[in-house]
């Protein structure tokens, strides 16, 4: 496998320069800031109230257990909304211009059970730099359970992957929780990319918050009088719902019929295009005119915009989309968007089905 140092995007067509000029002009003309937006603060407040109201309902409402499980599902969707909107922006330094605020809000990923430190490395660096390049973009690897890239070796079980992947989504949050610990204490790298060393305080924080997670997910309900089966079922319903929502949304960004999977030259490591254009080639949007998805997804249905401007708060993405479309048209770059969530899901299904067949 080529090392990251050898992968080079060799073209400089001026696309990025023109795009940056247009986007900077938009913010200047309208007197807007890229981060620290009052409308984002309001959105955060609404989601936080939703999240804690759902949690309080699950723990304290005098309702029968099946209704409480419905509350667990609502809680899971609120957790997903917080992750998409607040945690994701913060970990990309797109929520605030104050890095300390971003770090504190970004650590909410840890309280969901996922290390924000490891996430920033594998997502911000590996995924956003080497999008859809097998062996470097961890998020298309699938840890051998699924085949997303045509460059990945085929095994027989993959022919059913378009079906069983939905079952895998259910267990992904628990996998993240455990795999973080394994990566830090044992493996120490993603593929050939060595994880930056943890400082002692960072390592203690990662492991300590994992223990704290066990406390409030399992210990608190037990202390309030719930039985062990009730706690296990409630936690499972919550995190399985969270897993299927989060994984589905992220899959609709790059694992589609219209998105490309890039292969560097085997000797030079060159990719004969501009990096910014490669982000558009490997990425697609969905349902960008739908108010619900625009609000709920935290800009993750505007993935093209997000990959080009990950440090800009997602509330600006709908306005930036037209700027990006215009520049793409000027440079002859195909801009990919699925008109509906259903259309993107169907494309993802067909791609997984195609990848499940032997080459």
From Swiss-Prot:
List keywords of the entry alphabetically.
Fatty acid biosynthesis, Fatty acid metabolism, Iron, Lipid biosynthesis, Lipid metabolism, Membrane, Oxidoreductase, Transmembrane, Transmembrane helix
**Pathways per UniProt:** Lipid metabolism; polyunsaturated fatty acid biosynthesis
| InterPro entries xrefs | FA_desaturase_dom, Fatty_acid_desaturase
Q: Where is this site: Important for the regioselectivity of the enzyme?
A: 314
Q: Where is this motif: Histidine box-2?
A: 123-128
Recorded family membership: Belongs to the fatty acid desaturase type 2 family.
Q: What is this protein called?
A: sn-1 linoleoyl-lipid 6-desaturase
Q: Which organism is it from?
A: Synechocystis sp. (strain ATCC 27184 / PCC 6803 / Kazusa)
